[in-house]
Structures are given as structure tokens and as C-alpha cells.
Amino acid sequence: MDKILYDALTFDDVLLVPAYSNVLPKETVVKSRVTRNIEVNLPLVSAAMDTVTEAELAIALARAGGIGIIHKNLSIDVQARHVAKVKRFESGIIRNPITLFEDATIQEAIDLMLRHSISGIPVVERPTPEGCLLLKGIVTNRDLRMTTSSNEKITTIMTTDLITAQEDIDLLAAEEILMQNKIEKLLVIDEEGYLKGLITFKDIQKRKQCPDACKDMHGRLRVGAAVGIRSNTITRVDALVEAGVDVVAVDTAHGHSQAVLDMVATIKEKYPELEVIAGNVATPEAVRDLVKAGADAVKVGIGPGSICTTRVVAGVGMPQLTAIMNCAKEAAKTDTPIIADGGIKYSGDISKALAAGADTVMMGSIFAGTDESPGETILYEGRRFKAYRGMGSLGAMSEPEGSSDRYFQDASAETKKYVPEGIEGRIPAKGPLDEVVYQLIGGLKSSMGYCGVKNIEELKKNTRFVRITSAGLRESHPHDVMITREAPNYSTSH
């Protein structure tokens, strides 16, 4: 067997070849799939990293049209709360609204509103054995401001003269009722007066602001969450499912391992309807085995990330473009989407990844600098930066719920001596996520215009690459000039 198989390429090694086009960038469609059954309006996924994706960024990305994957360096309860926060941020009809019983106190209402960042709570009778909740009233922030005693029952201040609607109401009719009655919340009941949901004026406004938002069938923003291969993983999945998660990602550095295959199969056996992403991998054989285990999408990328040191610490990996092409060819046999994870520096790299066969791209560093990311903001020499670290860094692996299992290292070891496969650093602050997304998608649409393709599927099928030299790469970047004003989509820091 030959030891050296073939040359492998990454994004900087190639360019897409321009073609005849009658397609304008504004006419292109960038919808895609993140798993077999989950569509996204933008082919962007945020990485499950503790300096990248928590609820705030996941909300912003889903509203833009992509999807965020909440990292797992959190306790089970906290990670589930992040998922629930995304799912409750925007809804058509809130099907399981938070409620209070009639004997609750005003202080309990205050605590509940603060904990869940809500401004109104339906009040119901204690449930029947069948679990039905008979609506009795509603208590809002306005009611709470009118009282000074927090120990009184909420029945003393709640509104009982209620404006309600039936379950079959559409949002246009709901908006009209809300405006006519000058109220912010419309309670949805059945014919017997049992609470079935809640429609808020704020949710209707949010839908208008973000028409391309990535939502589930109930009008809620979509969100994913990472899980590992620890003994408590199924308990974590249980909590995430209860919180309403749309997809879980079995997230490891080496997805082609028996522990990952077993975990994917176990999750799918317990939750056959739950979408499961598995990874990371770099070979067709790995894709085949993960799909056979039950994966609904496969994440590709061994070591391409800017903060990843796997390729130099372990000497293992695959240049990302070749990895995507090899894996996508195998995935196409079972109609399984590929997520290209890592190595994206510019919007042009997104185009190359999709043209190579990926359905979406997962990014960490590009999103880590945004206002919505959870990384610490750092001031250095008069400039704003945000902390960014790999999940294989010492800091990330040493957290109480750290990522050591992602790299198959024992979290219970007394010495806590890990072998890191990532670093900790800082990146320039980039401002709001929606501005970053605008530039990324603008670059992708421009690429599609140059290539004469109208959608992602055509980008995958009807494009060609040309290999370039190091001189060609230098020529591709600005040269023989001193940049006096940086563009919003190009930086010399890469």
C-alpha cells in the first residue's frame, strides 16, 4: 500500500473559474439544508464553542436565516436554558406558555418574569388529571407596578376581563385584535376555556423585521446544541429535547470512532425524530459509517480552524477543500448534507466550500468577534478585541463541563494534565452579527453571479476550480499598495 496517497488542497490553493452568466447576484437564492429535514435560508452555522455560541448569538443568527449550535461547556440545566431562551424568543403561537396558579404570590410572578425575561404570565386553575389548564386571568408588568405588597396573591391584581381567540386564528387576524384592543398579549383557548397558547404583539413585529428567519413549524427560531460522549450525554439530550432543541451535534475531534458511532445510534434509537449531526471527519469511510449509525448530517473538518493545533500536535488531518470534496461524494449517495467546519477566513472561502460539495459552512472565528458572542471584550492599545479560544485549548478543557471528552481525554484524571489541541487568543471586534452576515452573504451572491449559478445546488454541480501557485495567491490579495482604510469584508490580520 502506498504511504503517500495524493496531494490535498485547501481554500487558498484554488479559485473558482468564472463562467458565462445571465444571473445577477441579487437574483440568487442561498437556501440550503443543515440536516436532511432542516432547511436554512442562509448556509451559515455558528460553531459550538464557548466563545462563539450561546443564546444571544444563536438568536441573532437564526433571525438572519442561519442556525447556531449552543456549546456544551455548560451544565445540563444551563445549556437547556439557552436552548429554551432561543425557542421562546419568537413564536407564532407560544404553545406552552409559562403559567402561574391562582394561589401564587406577586413575588413569584416577579421572580418568574425576571428569570425568563417575559412581561406577562397567564394565570390558570391547578390542572385536572388530564393536564388541562383552565384560564382564569393574566398578570403583566403593568399590574405589578400598581402594587407595593409582594406577598399578596396574584388574584388581587390580575386581569380577569380577558380578550381571547380560538386556536385556528391566523396571525393577521391576531394582530388586528391586538391593535383594536390596545393589548400586547392575546390568549389562545379552546371552546371550553382551556389555555392552548399565547400570541404576543412583539412576536408579530419580530416576524416582520426578519422575514428570512430560520423557524420551525410553530414559528419558533431554530437552534441546535452540542453533546459529547460522556456517561451523562443521554441525560443532557433529554433536557435539550425538553427545551425544544431542533438538532443535536455529537461533537468530537474524531467522529470516525466507535464511541461516536455508538452515541449517534443511541440517540437515534431513543429519539428517532430528533435530527443528529455527527463529526468531525475527513474521509468518505467516516461519512458512510456515521450515516449508517443514523446521522442526519456530517460535519467535515480535522484541524482547519484558526485556533486548532491538531495537525501539528497530532500530525493528523486533511486540507479542508479536499476533505469536503471526498466526503461530499460519499454523502451524496444517501442524500446526507455536509457541514464544512473550519478554515473560513473570507466570504470567498464560503463559496469554495459550497462549490466543493458542502451544504452549509460552520464558522467560529468570524462570529467570535461579533457583539453577540459570549467572549470577553478586551481593550488593547486603543482597539477592541474579543477573546477566542479553541475547544481543545487548556482553558476550554479545564472547565467543570469542559470539552476534554471532545478530544477523548479523561476529565476525571486527578492531575488534570491535558494535551491541548487548541490555543487561546483574541480577535478584532467586528460589531453586530447582522452586519457580518450581510458581507458574507453578499460575497457568496457575488461569487454565484460570476459563476452563472442561481442556487447552492447549481453552485455545487456547475462550477470548476483552478489550482493556483503561491504567486497566484499573492496576486489575489491587495498588493503593491498601503491600505489606508480597511473594507468591512477584508482584513490583513488573517
Curated annotation (Swiss-Prot):
Domain of life assignment: Bacteria
Keyword Nucleotide-binding: no
EC number of this enzyme: 1.1.1.205
Regulation: Mycophenolic acid (MPA) is a non-competitive inhibitor that prevents formation of the closed enzyme conformation by binding to the same site as the amobile flap. In contrast, mizoribine monophosphate (MZP) is a competitive inhibitor that induces the closed conformation. MPA is a potent inhibitor of mammalian IMPDHs but a poor inhibitor of the bacterial enzymes. MZP is a more potent inhibitor of bacterial IMPDH.
Coiled coil (residue ranges): none
Keywords assigned: CBS domain, GMP biosynthesis, Metal-binding, NAD, Oxidoreductase, Potassium, Purine biosynthesis, Repeat
Binding site for K(+): G303, G305, C308, E475, S476, H477
GO molecular function, one term: metal ion binding
Chemical reaction(s) catalysed: IMP + NAD(+) + H2O = XMP + NADH + H(+)
Pfam families per the UniProt record, alphabetical: CBS, IMPDH
Gene3D superfamilies recorded: Aldolase class I
Active site per UniProt: C308, R406
Keyword Lipid biosynthesis: no
Chain positions recorded as NAD(+) binding sites: D251, G301, I302, G303
HAMAP family the record matches: IMPDH
Quaternary state and interactors: Homotetramer.
UniProt-recorded name of the protein: Inosine-5'-monophosphate dehydrogenase
Source species: Chlorobaculum parvum (strain DSM 263 / NCIMB 8327) (Chlorobium vibrioforme subsp. thiosulfatophilum)
